[in-house]
Amino acid sequence: MNKVALITGASSGIGMETAKLLVTKGYTVYAAARRVERMQELEKAGVHILKMDVTDEASMVDGVNKILAAENRIDVLVNNAGYGSYGALEEVPLSEARYQFEVNIFGLARLTQLVLPKMREQHSGRIINISSIGGKIGEPHGTWYHATKYAVEGLSDSLRMELKQFGIDVVIIEPGAIKTEWTDIARNNMLKVSGKGPYKNLVEKHARMYERADKSGANPLVVAQTIVDSILADKPKTRYATGGGAKMILFMRRILSDRGFDKLLLGMMK
């Protein structure tokens, strides 16, 4: 019997590439997203498509129930759905900040709650949480986004210890700069929210840095390969930094003081 995986945020980028790759490894793959009209390519590859919004309780419950009704098992959950909306903390509406938490942390946590009873029953399973190097470092104008990713890191580290007794692994993936829609969304929101007020000067420099990073960013397939490697590993690492200078940036964060790293990052914004 094939193992069964659920991947969220699979209508593009990392999620889509992970679904395409994992189905070639003999997994039964369910790819979930809001924009299912963009997922015909996955369907042709043999991936099952689910319409799911990780901010909607009924949508998540229905999706998991459909998988369990069809397969009676779930072996892997890849919590990939994510949202980044940048802007100075002073200027980002709290409604927007809350929405980022709904997508990036509460949706992730709720979907994990929904799959855990079956994984415990199986005494096996793997939860793959897509964090970011932004769960280990901060940037100006990314206060709310980084807060969500720091939360993903803390949640995952605690959950890993809770679930060890049930034979369930928890893995954190920390991508660096990747060529996906995420960068454009974050940059455009940052300019819209904070590109004309008191933060304008640094925001414009930050936006230019993102343009450069987008051109040199890694292909989403690099991260997808790391995710699939973590799924196939007999004993996965607890976290994987991957793509887009991730390992170098995290190394610099470890060796520099807080202010030293601030200086390095601000110096890249020009």
What is each stretch, according to the model?
Residues K66-N79, S85:
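A glycine-rich helix->loop->beta "capping" turn
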Residues K164-D214:
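C-terminal beta-strand-loop-alpha-helix "lid" module of Rossmann-like NAD(P)-dependent dehydrogenases
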